From Swiss-Prot:
It comes from Streptococcus pyogenes serotype M1. This is Ribosome-recycling factor. It is found in: Cytoplasm. Responsible for the release of ribosomes from messenger RNA at the termination of protein biosynthesis. May increase the efficiency of translation by recycling ribosomes from one round of translation to another. Keywords: Cytoplasm, Protein biosynthesis. GO terms for biological process: translational termination. Belongs to the RRF family.
Length: 185
């Protein structure tokens, strides 16, 4: 039963890491990356639809994203959604495809994005600490219900803390890696 608490916590830690990884992938680092467009929703026949379901997104060059709509009539809707997004990139529509040229990041923009990365990383650490708190509470409930002894509780708390420390180290590593990617010219 005690192992179930740790396993559940570790699974939740892994989910937090995956979520953070997706979040970092959507922060542009001056290079074209199809995941930059993951959050873009297009108003397609009145329904918000993810862009990647309406078009293929390719990276023909280091700083260019090429969006090829499956349905050519949706090109105006896609262009409208890209203009309304917070990407800060103006789409170039040639009638059959849309090109997004990713501008080089200025030093100021890099620093702003690095701050954003730190903030996202800190939020992920808070999520990890909340998971730890839930696991510790579950362990204490088991001890109160006499399912585990006090010694087992102490061991379990140490194991939970070690798993938490490992999860936070991984977040720190991911954050440092993304900051390095952003700040390297």
């Amino acid at each position: 039963m005690a192992n179930a608490i740790i396993e559940t916590a570790k699974e939740r830690f892994a989910q937090s890491h995956q979520s953070l990884s997706r979040e970092y992938a959507s922060i542009r680092a001056g290079r074209a990356n199809a995941s930059l467009l993951d959050r873009i929703q297009v108003d397609y026949y009145g329904a918000p639809t993810p862009l990647n379901q309406l078009a293929s997104i390719t990276v023909p060059e280091a700083r260019v994203l090429l969006i090829s709509p499956f349905d050519k009539s949706s090109i105006k809707d896609i262009e409208r959604a890209l203009n309304a997004s917070d990407l800060g990139i103006t789409p170039a529509n040639d009638g059959s495809v849309i090109r997004l040229v990713i501008p080089a990041l200025t030093e100021e923009t890099r620093k702003e994005l690095a701050k954003e990365v730190k903030k996202v990383g800190e939020n992920a650490k808070i999520a990890i600490r909340n998971i730890r708190r839930d696991a510790m509470d579950d362990a204490k409930k088991q001890e109160k219900a006499k399912e585990i002894t006090e010694d087992e509780l102490k061991t379990l708390e140490k194991d939970i803390q070690k798993a938490t420390d490992d999860a936070i180290k991984e977040i720190d590593r991911m954050t440092a890696e993304k900051e390095k990617e952003l700040l390297s010219v």
